[in-house]
Design a protein with these regions (language model features):
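Terminal-tail/helix-coil boundary detector
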Residues: 2, 194, 222-254, 258, ...
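Structural preference for beta-strand elements that scaffold enzyme active sites
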Residues: 7, 14-18, 49-50, 77-81, ...
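Acidic-and-aromatic substrate-binding clefts and catalytic sites of carbohydrate-active enzymes
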Residues: 27-31, 54-63, 87-90, 125-129, ...
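Glycine/proline-rich, positively charged
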Residues: 45, 90-187, 198
Length: 351
């Protein structure tokens, strides 16, 4: 089966499934580094050629760089999306040398001459000054040839507008988006459509909650087995609670049985079918589910399927506000589980 592709810009095409890298950074069980690199080759050979990582995903940029080096025949067809997320404690006092140091470090780690896409985030756009000026330095590095394209992640629509109005050329936005978390729909997607900014969505499988394994199960409570489940359990609570989520899983299971696919693929197909969505990011610690995930390209949700899902989704409370507003509140229950200072440069790098 062929993997759907998406034209982000006239000169840049990606796979509509993106291999996520957060799960390789720790907090999701043991990672066999050698096997993880071999698995990357499996993804690329099967058509998932686009990888997502970040400057602060511990060890992941290096893994991708080692994969590129050890698989020279595959490296030319791979697209790598990394991030620039300055530490919270640095905000308001960031120098050009610090920004360029992080970008140069990503180039070294990934073993490339230029970064395909740098997705930018600033932890406190409203409380700590400088997020537009910092993005303009990324634009300077783009002009200098170190960055091919600039994207953003986890800004709300007002903040994204400030970046665009400030002269930052934004190609993509990475929001959290799923049937349970539809915050991008009210403002972010309409604005992005008007500016030709493409959505590359994460959280599409709720960290593993969108599987048949959870159907009919009692509500789980802390401590959960990994950070993803902790994060997305809060989203389920905001959606309307475990009971309503079970209704959604039941509807998805029925649809999946009809098309001979899993609950996860129903959720994934729903996201891929939304306006302005270029791709969905699926985190993986191994390649064991890759063949199953590719089945998302073998079916379509018909009118009856959409009505069945809408019947449940119409009952939801949904998380409040615009994209990432809840998570940005350090005193709130979403913000309290975030890690804000994971991007310290190596001691030999620039300050």
């Amino acid at each position: 089966m062929s993997v759907e592709r998406f034209q982000v810009t006239p000169d840049y095409e990606i796979s509509r499934l993106i291999k996520g890298g957060w799960h390789l950074a720790g907090g999701h069980g043991d990672v066999d580094r050698g096997q993880a690199i071999k698995d990357m080759a499996v993804f690329v050979e099967k058509g998932i050629t686009t990888f997502d990582c970040a400057d602060h995903y511990t060890g992941v940029e290096e893994m991708i760089g080692d994969f590129r080096e050890s698989h020279p025949s595959l490296a030319p067809v791979v697209q790598v999306h990394t991030k620039f997320v300055p530490d919270y404690e640095k905000l308001g006092n960031i120098k050009r040398e610090y920004i360029e140091g992080i970008i140069d470090r990503s180039i070294r780690r990934l073993k490339v001459e230029r970064l395909d896409l740098v997705q930018y985030y600033w932890w406190d756009p409203d409380g700590k000054p400088g997020f537009v000026d910092t993005a303009l330095i990324l634009r300077d590095l783009q002009v200098a040839g170190k960055i091919a394209r600039i994207g953003v992640t986890n800004f709300n629509t007002r903040q994204l507008r400030m970046l665009v109005d400030g002269g930052v050329p934004i190609a993509t936005n990475q929001p959290q988006y799923s049937p349970v978390d539809r915050r991008p729909e009210s403002k972010m997607i309409p604005y992005s459509q008007s500016k030709n900014i493409v959505q590359l969505c994460y959280g599409t499988l709720l960290g593993g909650f969108f599987t048949g394994d959870w159907l009919g199960k009692p509500e789980p409570f802390e401590p959960l087995v990994n950070r993803s489940l902790t994060k997305y359990k809060l989203i389920i609570e905001d959606f309307g609670g475990w009971g309503l989520f079970q209704q959604l899983l039941q509807a998805m299971k029925k649809i999946g049985d009809k098309h001979d696919v899993t609950v996860a693929l129903v959720a994934l197909r729903w996201v891929l079918d939304q306006p302005n969505v270029g791709a969905a990011i699926v985190g993986a610690t191994s390649a064991r589910h890759v063949d199953e995930n590719l089945k998302v390209f073998t079916f379509a949700l018909d009118a009856d399927d959409k009505r069945a899902l809408d019947a449940v989704l119409s009952q939801c409370q949904s998380p409040e506000g615009d994209c990432y507003d809840l998570e940005r509140d350090k005193k709130g229950r979403h913000g309290q589980i975030m890690r804000y200072n994971q991007n310290a440069l190596e001691t030999h790098a620039l300050p």
